[in-house]
């Protein structure tokens, strides 16, 4: 029965038309930095861009340290790291200033944060 269902799903996917509507290309996207400056993705054309969802109270908070190492080592070779804090899961509380201060004092980061 599982094989029949799987086969049906595969066949059905061939006959459906994707209707994705692209209103904006990734290169047209911009962020507002934690300092209030606009970060335009298009400014980083021809560079390797790493955009990472970050939070200062999650199990992966130490990723800040690794991201800073990556940024420090490869920024002169065209790597750009952008941290995007999100409080969707209640793991990034505080104001922009508190988040910025925490990241800079705890992990010494200097890559852009939104």
Where are these regions (language model features)?
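Bacterial Sec-dependent N-terminal signal peptides
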Residues: 1-23
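N-terminal "domain-start" segment that seeds a small globular fold
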Residues: 19-42
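A glycine-biased structural micro-motif
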Residues: 23-24, 46, 76
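Residue-level detector of conserved, well-ordered beta-strand and adjacent loop positions
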Residues: 32, 52, 114
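A mature extracytoplasmic/lumenal domain signature
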Residues: 43-45, 85
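Amphipathic alpha-helical repeat scaffolds
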Residues: 46, 53-57
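Structural microenvironment flanking redox-active thiols in thiol-disulfide oxidoreductases
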Residues: 60-114
């Amino acid at each position: 029965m599982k094989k029949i269902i799987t086969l049906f799903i595969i066949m059905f996917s061939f006959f459906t038309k994707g209707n994705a509507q692209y209103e904006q290309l990734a290169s047209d996207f911009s962020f507002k930095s934690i300092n209030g400056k606009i970060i335009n993705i298009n400014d980083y054309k021809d560079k390797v861009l790493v955009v990472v969802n970050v939070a200062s109270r999650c199990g992966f908070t130490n990723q800040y340290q690794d991201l800073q190492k990556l940024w420090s080592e490869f920024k002169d070779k065209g790597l750009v790291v952008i941290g995007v804090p999100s409080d969707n899961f209640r793991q990034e509380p505080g104001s922009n200033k508190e988040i910025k201060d925490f990241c800079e004092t705890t992990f010494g980061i200097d890559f852009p944060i939104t």
